[in-house]
């Protein structure tokens, strides 16, 4: 492997902000935020909106996320 061309592969904490679930794994993601993990060490923090803890496929719960009223517009347009 060529030196100095590969990203740094390190332990990173991912935080699912939807379900408030955190997990520690290894990644090349870079971030300026850090968090204190359960082992007392500080790790880089990457915030994600959806992970296996909040995705409907994995949780078995179906919920609609309507960010701009698109569902209401659709229902109004095609209402009988």
UniProtKB/Swiss-Prot annotation:
A single GO BP: translation
Example GO molecular function: structural constituent of ribosome
Keyword field contains Ribosomal protein: yes
One Gene Ontology CC term in the entry: ribonucleoprotein complex
Ranges in a coiled coil: none
Domain of life: Bacteria
InterPro entries for this protein: Ribosomal_bL28/bL31-like_sf, Ribosomal_bL31, Ribosomal_bL31_B, Ribosomal_bL31_sf
Pfam entry (one): Ribosomal_L31
Subunit architecture: Part of the 50S ribosomal subunit.
Name of the protein: Large ribosomal subunit protein bL31B
Organism this protein belongs to: Xylella fastidiosa (strain M12)
């Amino acid at each position: 492997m060529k030196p100095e061309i590969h990203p740094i592969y390190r332990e990173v904490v991912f935080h699912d902000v939807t379900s408030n679930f955190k997990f520690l794994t290894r990644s090349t993601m870079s971030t300026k935020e850090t968090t204190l993990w359960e082992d007392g060490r500080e790790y880089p923090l990457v915030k994600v909106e959806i992970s296996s803890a909040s995705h409907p496929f994995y949780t078995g719960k179906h919920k609609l996320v309507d960010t701009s009223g698109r569902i209401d517009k659709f229902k109004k347009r095609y209402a009988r």
